[in-house]
Amino acid sequence: MPVPAPVLYPPFNILRLSHVEYMVRDLAASKAFYVDTLGLYVTEEGDGRIWLRAMEERGHHCICLTEGTDPSARVLGFKLYDEPDLDKAADWFAAEGLPTEWVERPHQGRTLRTADP
């Protein structure tokens, strides 16, 4: 299988995956798995959520567990290169007909939400 050619001049620059929010049925069991089995650290708990980070994570969290009835990966967050890239991403998603919304999220800076097609 050939390796696809890189996109050298993307419409905006993504540095890395930032965080994942998982919807889980049993918050205590999920906490035990991520903390006791995988060795992640709890950075905060409350209101049906647990924020976790790995040893080398520089931010507040890389995983958020949220209690709910439908287990799923609810959110994938990406770290962009800089603030202008966040504006470029908003413009690009809107031009592609995808929803865009500026949202407030605990422990995150300026945050843009969209949805994949």
Q: Predicted regions span which residues?
A:
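A broad, low-specificity signal marking well-ordered, structured residues that form hydrophobic/aromatic
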Residues: 50, 63, 112
